Design a protein with these regions (language model features):
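Gram-negative bacterial Sec-dependent N-terminal signal peptides
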Residues: 2-22
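Conserved beta-strand positions that form and line the central face of beta-propeller blades
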Residues: 41, 82-86, 132, 180, ...
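Cap/lid segment of the alpha/beta-hydrolase catalytic domain
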Residues: 372-498, 502-503, 508, 530, ...
């Protein structure tokens, strides 16, 4: 017979547990006191973005919407209020544009439906006419050179003759006439031209994954100039020539770990170190627009820092850095170097653009990219260094919701659900700065952790090369180690972590739910590959120069051993292990990760009666460029995560309006999705 005291203790414990469970607030409850930021403010069209100035200082330009579609606007430099749209895109929108040195002429790139077959267009501001300079089907234009000495022409690489390799043409901006400069029969990956459009240097990939740097010989033939071993090929490359052709800049990690910038005297071959940093590779540069001489170099370890190498601009950069505690970048400098267009961003503030009058030393605020976010409860981002299980340092970025960090000190006061947001590439990196996804997720009640796992770039070649052969291996271990760090720091608990990402981040999501099926509460895969064999067998043809690197870093699909390895590391192989909710987003025109990658794993899950929600956009590619589609997918994601992690969710409402969203499978898996689709009229715009 049980002792009465034991029975009483058991009853008291049960009641206490029930009361505790009932009292535990959800992530949505805890964030309820913070104003909800509308998805439209975060993911709709920016009011103004990509602000530039023409080289002659005559015009100010930016990208802004016309009837909901992004186009290029131009205004007199001294009167932005007189701006007018100079492009008339009515479908996908224009995001990438730049000025030529020809007065009154700008250029822009546009593809169709995300297929990445980019055409190059020239716009004559006097006539308002746009001309397609690359009017060839299935051709991807690559801008190879612009020169103030030849303002009426531009160098363009085109692969219309051979889909794998780009020939180089000089193109007349007014007529569109192209003149062949180099028929690429030598399988050249890229060229460097001087200011007179003479091709001086080139780079060619080798079967061992390394590369040869070539120089034009006296007889006009290419001859070997330098050798880049495979282990250095992602961190070593020739940069550009100064306008006087006397100096070649070269980023180089050979004989060292982090990539440094060198200046090579073309006549003597003497190499001079310009800048190095033991923590991180050198990044962007600021060059004198009249000479091409490098004046400052950026290094991004925890934060992006500008290192001055020419004292002539030291005072200028000090003035820019005084804008605030965030990061600054220089978008454009006029040819006379009197005016700079500067972008300033902090994690808790979207981009703000300034005009810098260099002779006067004064800054004038121009525009905020997203003024709708001014005064909204945006939160800081905290750079952190996380130790992996084998003692590698994983530079990462933590964003905490106000419900977990009321005093904004970067230390969690109580655990909240966490979204592990994995970057794509994987040969890329996460950096400090404003991120719409980080702010969105934090505003819904989640902590967000972005991790630079091994294989990421920017931290030296050893860290990048440590990812070779480690898809679903040590690269994934790094993500798991980062989650454990967050648990130990009190940011979250083991049972309330979601994984989410695009491209490689989508693969990491699928790997997380298949290779480690108990590690995550749910996953959001955006254009992620599920089958590494089919991924590598369907890459775009113009990736030929990069393919040997892919084979060495991932696995070689041309060999039996490589196929076996790739099969073992493919989430599709382990689809039967999925037991947590999965949301998949895919663009039907993706040239990198084909729609079949998502189709395959969805079909495998259906065959095993495993639930999945599959969202497909017929007018998108590798990611969702149209704001209508991006908002639509994020509306679905928000409901999905709220169901999984308990954060708050703004109703789908009208966020499908104008989008091409379709849900072939699993519309009933996300609250409100099936109902929202019933009244939706699909709008496909390529």
């Amino acid at each position: 017979m049980r002792h009465p005291a034991s029975r009483l203790t058991l009853l008291a414990s049960t009641v206490a547990f029930a009361l505790a469970a009932q009292a535990a607030p959800s992530a949505a409850d805890r964030i309820a006191g913070t104003e909800l930021i509308a998805r439209d403010a975060l993911f709709g069209n920016p009011e103004r973005a990509n602000v530039q100035m023409s080289p002659d200082g005559k015009y100010l330009s930016w990208v802004a919407a016309v009837d909901g579609v992004l186009n290029v606007w131009v205004a007199p430099a001294d009167n932005p209020a007189q701006a007018k749209a100079v492009t008339q895109d009515k479908a996908r929108g224009i995001r990438s544009y730049f000025w030529s040195y020809q007065p009154d002429t700008l250029l822009y790139l546009r593809d169709s439906g995300g297929d990445e077959d980019f055409h190059l267009y020239a716009v004559d501001l006097k006539t308002g006419q746009a001309k397609d300079l690359t009017p060839f089907p299935k051709t991807t234009a690559q801008v190879a050179g612009l020169s103030p000495k030849h303002p009426g022409t531009i160098l363009v690489g085109m692969n219309d003759r051979d889909a794998q390799w780009h020939d180089v043409y000089k193109v007349d901006l007014a007529s569109g006439t192209r003149t062949l400069l180099e028929k690429n029969d030598a399988q050249i990956a890229g060229y460097i031209a001087d200011a007179d459009y003479t091709l001086k240097y080139a780079q060619r990939s080798r079967p061992d994954g390394g590369a040869d740097v070539l120089r034009r010989g006296a007889n006009g033939a290419w001859e070997k100039f330098d050798d880049i071993p495979f282990e250095d090929v992602l961190t070593t490359s020739p940069g550009g020539l100064t306008l006087d052709r006397r100096t070649l800049y070269f980023t180089d990690s050979r004989g060292r770990n982090t990539a440094a910038l060198f200046a090579i005297d073309v006549a003597s071959g003497k190499r001079t170190l310009v800048l190095e940093d033991a923590r991180a590779d050198v990044g962007g540069t600021l060059a004198d627009p009249a000479t091409g001489k490098v004046q400052a170099v950026s290094v991004d370890y925890l934060r992006d820092e500008w290192k001055v190498v020419d004292p002539a601009i030291r005072a200028d950069l000090q003035k820019l850095e005084a804008i605030g505690p965030g990061d600054v970048s220089v978008n454009t400098r006029t040819l006379d170097d009197k005016t700079w267009i500067v972008a300033y961003s902090a994690a808790e503030a979207p981009l703000v653009y300034y005009r810098y009058d260099r002779p006067a030393g004064t800054l004038t605020k121009l525009f905020s990219a997203r003024p709708k976010l001014e005064g909204k409860p945006l939160v800081p981002q905290w750079p952190v260094e996380i130790a992996s299980r084998d003692n590698k340092t994983l530079v990462s970025y933590l964003t905490l919701p106000r419900s977990a960090d009321a005093d904004s000190d970067g230390k969690a006061e109580a655990p909240v659900p966490l979204v592990l947001l994995v970057h794509g590439g994987p040969w890329a990196r996460d950096s400090y700065g404003y991120g719409s996804y980080n702010q969105w997720l934090a505003n819904r009640g989640y902590a967000v952790l972005s991790v630079n796992f091994r294989g990421s770039t920017g931290f030296g070649k050893a860290f990048t090369n440590a990812g070779n052969g480690e898809w679903a291996g040590k690269m994934h271990d790094d993500l798991l180690d980062a989650v454990q760090w967050a648990v130990k720091q009190g940011v979250t608990t083991q049972d309330q972590v979601a994984i989410m990402g695009g491209s490689y981040g989508g693969y990491a999501t699928l790997a997380g739910l298949t290779f480690t099926p108990d590690a995550f509460a749910c996953g959001v895969d955006i254009v992620g590959p599920s089958n590494l064999n089919t991924l590598l067998s369907t890459v775009p043809p113009y990736w030929a120069s990069f393919f040997e690197q892919l084979a060495k870093r991932m696995g070689d699909p041309r060999t039996d051993a490589g196929k076996k390895w790739l099969t073992e590391r493919s989430p599709l192989t382990r689809a039967d292990q999925i037991k947590k909710p999965l949301l998949i987003g895919q663009g039907a025109n993706d040239p990198r990760v084909k729609q079949a990658e998502s189709d395959q794993i969805v079909k495998a899950m259906q065959a095993r009666n495993i639930p999945v929600t599959y969202v497909l956009f017929p007018d998108e590619g590798h990611g969702f460029a149209r704001p209508e589609n991006n908002k639509a997918f994020n509306a679905v994601t928000e409901g999905f995560l709220a169901q999984c992690l308990g954060g708050r969710a703004e109703p789908i409402g009208k966020d499908f309006t104008g989008s091409s969203i379709s849900v072939p499978v699993g519309a009933d898996g996300v609250p409100g999705l099936a109902e929202a689709l019933k009244g939706h009229t699909q709008e496909v715009k390529k």
